[in-house]
From Swiss-Prot:
Tissue specificity as recorded in UniProt: Ubiquitously expressed with highest levels in skeletal muscle, heart and kidney.
Naturally occurring in which organism (per UniProt): Homo sapiens
Presence of keyword Mitochondrion: no
Role according to the record: Inositol 5-phosphatase which acts on inositol 1,4,5-trisphosphate, inositol 1,3,4,5-tetrakisphosphate, phosphatidylinositol 4,5-bisphosphate and phosphatidylinositol 3,4,5-trisphosphate. Has 6-fold higher affinity for phosphatidylinositol 4,5-bisphosphate than for inositol 1,4,5-trisphosphate. Negatively regulates assembly of the actin cytoskeleton. Controls insulin-dependent glucose uptake among inositol 3,4,5-trisphosphate phosphatases; therefore, is the specific regulator for insulin signaling in skeletal muscle.
Protein name according to UniProt: Inositol polyphosphate 5-phosphatase K
Keywords: Cataract, Congenital muscular dystrophy, Cytoplasm, Disease variant, Endoplasmic reticulum, Hydrolase, Intellectual disability, Lipid metabolism
Disease per UniProt entry: Muscular dystrophy, congenital, with cataracts and impaired intellectual development: An autosomal recessive form of muscular dystrophy with onset in early childhood and characterized by progressive muscle weakness. Almost all patients also have early-onset cataracts and intellectual disability of varying severity. Some patients have seizures.
Subcellular location: Endoplasmic reticulum; Cytoplasm
Region described as Required for interaction with GPR78 and PAK1: 318-448
Residue span of region Required for ruffle localization: 321-448
Length: 448
């Protein structure tokens, strides 16, 4: 998956939905259909990128979340897994959480390179502020995703810009042949950036919002001003702010702050992106899209119906047009060749000549609708369970003795230890009923 050679003329379009929300320690609401665009059949989404800030990070909550999935991750997996989305990766630093979900057919073409946390609170020692990053390869292209929470208050604009630079500086992925983050094909950067509206008073800002006169407010938005003066920040693009400022609201209402502080509304919650600069582009010219890799914004909006926080969530929907650098998976699993004997199921698979196999690779058996790679019902270590190997065709056996008789469909996934990713996935199939035991109460227990 390290080759940069274009592999065939056929292009591919991926639809990506990005969400940022400062949830102010609240539990998930009952319904996220609007935020996740679940009822919009025209979107046909491929990937969800979800960043949350200010998750409950009390000591009891953190200890519980270390042993189990946090309530937001569990809720999102429950919502998205029936739609064939699988949690690909996540990273959390105290109250800052980043999650990536993808349709299962894309898994063999997503390689997780690294996850990283950069604390900037308390002089860089505390993770209540800072950024978290997932660095991955998507169909052979380098993509970095950053969720951040920058310092608050209108007077801390310079500190926000310093933290922005600090987070970017610390996000370089470790490993051979991984380019500097600024040489990645795409950076998606979002979060509670906390930029405020300068100069204008509270009454003027609220009246402008009431009359939907946002143009004058854009000119005094601190992020918009900074982009005019900072060459690197200028390379990050953003959609037009055609929605009301997303902070600060009274909870469970659409009323801006009525407390004694009466904070001035601001567009604190933002979604930015940056495409790799092409050699022909100068430092002061817009970045032209590469002919084989381009990103377009389909929609950028806030979601005013949610009131659990003093922030409103923001989403951006993108179309990523790319010409895959990787056109075939590293592993091909062949359920049509599986057969059973006693309590075991034999699985055949083939690998590419350059696949870096490891004895610690494993093949998982999953029910269709899995939430993440740990939801297997059985598995086999490739190094321990391989029974034959010839002409690049391998066979392993998987224990199915604890799987009750069912008409459910299953999937096989091959997990590469060295690549830290699923590198092969089978089509759905059913296991012949005679191969499964009839006790409906038995369930396989994960061993890893």
């Amino acid at each position: 998956m390290s080759s940069r050679k274009l592999s065939g003329p056929k292009g591919r379009r991926l639809s990506i939905h990005v969400v940022t929300w400062n949830v102010a320690s609240a539990a998930p609401p009952l319904d996220l259909s609007d935020l996740l665009q679940l009822n919009n059949r025209n979107l046909n989404l491929d990937i969800y990128v979800i960043g949350l800030q200010e998750l409950n990070s009390g000591i009891i909550s953190l200890l519980s979340d270390a042993a189990f999935n946090d309530s937001w991750s569990s809720f999102l997996m429950d919502v998205l897994s029936p739609l064939s989305f699988i949690k690909v990766s996540h990273v959390r630093m105290q109250g800052i959480l980043l999650l990536v979900f993808a349709k299962y057919q894309h898994l063999p073409y997503i390689q997780i390179l690294s996850t990283k946390s950069t604390p900037t609170g308390l002089f860089g020692y505390w993770g209540n502020k800072g950024g978290v990053n997932i660095c991955l390869k998507l169909y052979g292209y380098y993509v970095s995703i950053i969720n951040c929470h920058l310092p608050p208050h209108i007077s801390n604009n310079y500190q926000r810009l310093e933290h922005f630079d600090r987070i970017l500086e610390m996000q370089n992925c470790e490993g051979r042949d991984i380019p500097n983050i600024l040489d990645h094909d795409l950076i998606i950067w979002f979060g509670d950036m906390n930029f405020r509206i300068e100069d204008f008073g509270l009454h003027f800002v609220r009246e402008s919002i009431k009359n939907r006169c946002y143009g004058g407010l854009w000119e005094k938005d601190q992020l918009s001003i900074a982009k005019k003066h900072d060459p690197l920040l200028r390379e990050f693009q953003e959609g037009r702010l055609l929605f009301p400022p997303t902070y600060k609201f009274d909870r469970n209402s659409n009323d801006y702050d009525t407390s004694e502080k009466k904070r001035k509304p601001a567009w604190t919650d933002r979604i930015l992106w940056r495409l790799k600069r092409q050699p022909c582009a100068g430092p002061d010219t817009p970045i032209p899209p590469a002919s084989h890799f381009s990103l377009s914004l389909r929609g950028y909006s806030s979601h005013m119906t949610y009131g659990i926080s003093d922030h409103k969530p923001v989403s951006g929907t993108f179309d990523l047009e790319l010409k895959p650098l990787v056109s075939a998976p590293l592993i091909v699993l062949m359920p049509e060749d599986l057969w059973t004997v006693e309590n075991d199921m034999m699985v055949s698979y083939s690998s590419t000549s350059d696949f870096p196999s490891s004895p610690w690779d494993w093949i998982g058996l999953y029910k269709v609708g899995l939430r993440d790679v740990n939801d297997y019902v059985s598995y086999a270590w490739v190094g321990d369970s391989k029974v034959s190997c010839s002409d690049n065709l391998n066979q392993v056996y998987i224990d199915i003795s604890n799987i009750p008789t069912t008409e459910d469909e299953f999937l096989l996934c091959y997990y590469s230890n060295s690549l830290r990713s699923v590198v092969g996935i089978s089509r759905p199939f059913q296991i012949p009923p005679g191969s499964l035991r009839e006790d409906p109460l038995g369930e396989a227990q994960p061993q890893i």
